[in-house]
Amino acid sequence: MSVFYQYEVIVVGGGHAGTEAALAAARQGVRTLLLTHNIETLGQMSCNPAIGGIGKGHLVKEIDALGGLMAQAADQAGIHFRMLNARKGPAVRATRAQADRALYKAVVRKALEQQSCLSLFQQAVTDLVVKGERVVGVRTQLGLTFYAPAVVLTVGTFLGGRIHVGLTNHEGGRAGDPPANILSSRLRELPFRVARLKTGTPPRIDGRSIDYSQLEVQPGDDPVPVFSFLGSAEDHPQQVSCHITRTNLCTHEIIRASLDRSPIYSGEIEGIGPRYCPSIEDKVVRFSDKASHQIFIEPEGLETFEIYPNGISTSLPFDVQVALVRSIQGFEQAHITRPGYAIEYDFFDPRDLKPSLETSFLQGLYFAGQINGTTGYEEAAAQGLIAGLNAGLQVQEKEPWYPRRDEAYIGVLIDDLITCGTSEPYRMFTSRAEYRLLLREDNADLRLTPIGRELRVVDEVRWRRFNTKWKAIERENQRLVQQRIEPDKVSEGEAVTLLGEPLRREYRLIELLRRPHISYEKLMRLIGEPMAVEPAVAEQIAIQAKYAGYIERQQLEIARQQRHESLRLPLDLNYHQVRGLSVEVQEKLARVQPATLGQATRIPGVTPAAISLLLVYLKRARFLEETGV
């Protein structure tokens, strides 16, 4: 057998999931092959050229903390940065960057080409090589066979992909790319549960045909935020402004008059679209009382005139697209460079996955990204990292690793998918995390980088930077706990200016920092000292001080929940034998087959009373004693 054809991990697909999967496997020193139908589209931003947002920015920070690429690529390609929810608490603050598509792809490709233990090869995969109940490789359209004990499928919208513009449709993985229909047919022969989803994209506009004088300017933040814990504002290219406009009643009337030509409303499309990123047709129909809908005018890059009008995703016929676009203020003379379209594709029920993202039916086969029913670059990249990491661990005969819900948004994402499944494209929000005060953007490295180091996906540069930051936090926290300030050391006027009231007794510095409106900077001014630490360290110290009580309560709640989380349920448990459970609950438990009691609590329809009955049954059957809990 030729060495060229033998690898330890094969990743199929070069999108956001595939690139993170390949890098995560290769960083462990595992010989990895990334197969893509087109090397030129590695890291392609198929829809909106943006990274981050509410919940999504948290995922990007966690990917970065585990040594992933997305945050660094966003920093090096980001041309417009904003901190969303900046006036709210730290748990829901989220970074978002508008990226230059070409720059982003270039950063991703360079990282892949420079990664040791990683090879790239351009070939479409058409089949899996299966031996018994294990995947052992893949076959390509040229008839080449590549062997590996672990295969990660990150095929996006390419499985059975069909593109719709009006009542016209054709096969396609995305505009300009062929679908993976042969692979889709092969996977349908396996015992996976398969369904259809759809997503869409707006028409692209030539920015030279837009009248910007009629649009509202949306500048980026100053100072400019940074995504990566290794990054700085100096990494960013030139920054530009975005703009805002709105649809109007004329736009809505054009859309309503054309609904009979919409593939969504004519029944041509059966797949369910993303709830939180609906098409403009959906918005007009579902929110008929609204006189207008906001549109964000976002540049596609520094070296192109193309504009992404975020908010008017559509699959209406092209003539209707022209009419609705030109009905919008500032777009009266707009020239469409690419039509909007919807794409319908296969996805596989993620309840057929293990928490490691390995499939339950074929050992060594992992799924990540839109194949699991998610939407978004960030959700895909997070899954890719975990799948690639675990594929690498498996070939090294090591135990799988995946974060719990209380450890990371990545853990929330995976647990939601494998426990509840999804009937629509799944998008991450901060509201999905019950422990979001602990899972902030700012502390993703403190939560995950030590674990990443143990798993060999965090390099020496990141590890040194992390330790410097962590030691600075510990050292400064200790100083603030020990150092005191007396009333006679501060003038009454200075105290009133900085604290809002005179200093009436002796305080430890940490006590003053716990006050809601006292920043670390104000505290240093109060004691007449310069900033002792860098801003990221100061931010972390202030948050930990102000939210100490809330954080402690959440940690106690997690400890209580861990009793359920750690109780593993036997794989052969017959739920129909558990007396008192309703037939509905029995069927749901039997279908999902939760791995732990904690997972069972999160299945929709499984009540606390049902969990109590299950606990009683387990005690009687002596399962608790056998598991040592």
From Swiss-Prot:
NAD(+) binds at residues 273-287. Keywords: Cytoplasm, FAD, Flavoprotein, NAD, tRNA processing. One of its GO terms (biological process) is tRNA wobble uridine modification. FAD binds at residues 13-18. The keyword Zinc-finger does not apply. It is found in: Cytoplasm. Its cofactor is FAD. One of its GO terms (molecular function) is flavin adenine dinucleotide binding. It comes from the Bacteria. One of its GO terms (cellular component) is cytosol. The keyword Flavoprotein applies. InterPro entries: FAD/NAD-bd_sf, GIDA_C_N, MnmG, MnmG-rel, MnmG-rel_CS, MnmG_C, MnmG_C_subdom, MnmG_C_subdom_sf. Homodimer. Heterotetramer of two MnmE and two MnmG subunits. Belongs to the MnmG family. NAD-binding protein involved in the addition of a carboxymethylaminomethyl (cmnm) group at the wobble position (U34) of certain tRNAs, forming tRNA-cmnm(5)s(2)U34. This is tRNA uridine 5-carboxymethylaminomethyl modification enzyme MnmG. It comes from Nitrosococcus oceani (strain ATCC 19707 / BCRC 17464 / JCM 30415 / NCIMB 11848 / C-107). The gene is mnmG.
